[in-house]
Amino acid sequence: SCPNPYLRVFPIKEVADIGRPKGIPLIIDNTASPVICKPLAHGAAIVMHSLTKYIGGHGTSIGGIVVDGGNFDWTKNRKRQPLLNEPDQSYGGAVWIDAVPQLTGANIPFVIRLRVVLLRDTGAPLAPFNAWQIIQGLETVGLRMKQHCSNAEKVVTFLETQKKVQNVIYPTNHQGEIKERALKYMKGG
């Protein structure tokens, strides 16, 4: 949503609107802006976060999260998602796009397949103690993100007055369309 190093906010809705009719889900890495940016509300189908950064807030545990918004029609173009739309022999020939809604009542075949197949194949589930540590940070992520943004704005204001500083990169310091996207997508900080 807000990639390094130039902090040019990604055009979430615009890209999602191009892909959806073609059966292409928009997957966003929102590690840099949890709470501030809500990609699912703007048309993203899947959102990822590194839990180690802002969400955990302390760097004691390595982890990640994938959120399936349940808002994407995985049947729109079945050929684009063969892993979801063709029989999975490792699960008795289950077709994820058909089985998941029947079992869960939700349109989340991507994240269910990710959870059961990828975790089975890689053995990468989060340990209970690490989950507990991340939850400790999650409790205050909203407050911390607000303070991070407030502090960043103060640093930007200070740096802009320094003669030895040639350029300050900050999402709302850009001009035109890039600034408009920052104001549109980055709220809550």
Question: PLM features: residue spans?
Answer:
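Conserved PLP-enzyme active-site core in the AAT-like
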Residues: 1-161, 169
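Conserved PLP-binding catalytic core of the aspartate aminotransferase-like
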Residues: 166-189
